[in-house]
Design a protein with these regions (language model features):
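NTP-dependent nucleotidyl-transfer catalytic core
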Residues: 1-247
Length: 247
């Protein structure tokens, strides 16, 4: 979203567009995906495999470089992130208020990914993880009937699992919970199975066994699966407005 806004946004803001901040940032999430797919198609037409094209698409390389700069706290990139992140959470607050929802504690991945990286380093020291020639870090779970899982990219930037490791660790350290329940759709069943197993192999079975993934079936449109990056979604704010109107 940040890169697409920077390249195609023309300085558009929630105020100038009249859009909720989360909707505006979502718009550029879709815009990024549209340009990315166009570039992949062009590279495939030039003879690259689809896997190569996805890796070599210029806009994806730019996004990866922006992530690297963000993790390095580049002032320009970090400032843009703070601005757009603010737009998103202002939009979320409006939606949560309409639902009467509030939270005692919010954990942000931007505040836990470094802890996740520390856990990755711990795993390397313990021999639980291994480093490939491209410098990326993986865990081999094939003996457990699963797969190999990427934990850190070759350029040192984090992935979702890095962040989730850090977040889970911090939640239990701060709260000493009896159970931690993740309410997430069933498309993430494998992810949470891997998360629990990694934490167990790191030596945290005393609390990782108390992680529960409360899975639910995905809601689909008649046309198929909803995909936020393609803009094929039912907007929560519209749904709330419709329910209020119907009531």
């Amino acid at each position: 979203s940040m890169l697409a806004w920077q390249k195609f946004g023309g300085g558009e803001t929630p105020a100038s567009s009249g859009m909720k901040g989360d909707h505006l940032v979502g718009k550029y999430y879709v815009e990024f995906d549209r340009h990315y797919k166009e570039e992949v198609r062009e590279l495939v037409a030039q003879g690259q495999s689809e896997e190569e094209a996805k890796r070599n698409a210029p806009i994806m390389r730019e996004a990866q470089e922006m992530l690297r700069k963000w993790e390095a706290r580049d002032s320009e990139v970090y400032s843009l992130w703070e601005t757009m992140n603010g737009w998103v959470y202002e939009g979320f607050d409006v939606t949560y208020k309409a639902l009467g929802v509030d939270f005692d504690k919010v954990y942000y991945e931007s505040q836990t990914y470094l802890l996740g990286k520390e856990l990755v380093e711990e795993g390397l020291r313990k021999g639980v993880f291994y480093r490939r020639p491209d410098n990326s870090v993986w865990i081999d779970l094939t003996a457990d009937g699963l797969d190999e899982k990427l934990l850190l990219r070759g350029d040192g930037t984090s992935v979702y699992m890095t962040q989730d490791l850090g977040t889970a660790y911090r939640r239990f350290e701060e709260n000493r919970l009896d159970d931690m329940i993740y309410v997430v759709g069933n498309e993430q069943n494998y992810h949470f199975q891997v998360l629990k197993l990694i934490l167990k192999k790191l030596g945290y079975a005393d609390w990782s066994d108390h992680i529960t993934h409360l899975s639910y079936g995905m809601v689909e449109l008649p046309e198929g699966k909803m995909k936020s990056r393609e803009g094929t979604v039912v907007d929560a704010d519209d749904l709330i407005a419709d329910m209020v109107s119907t009531a």
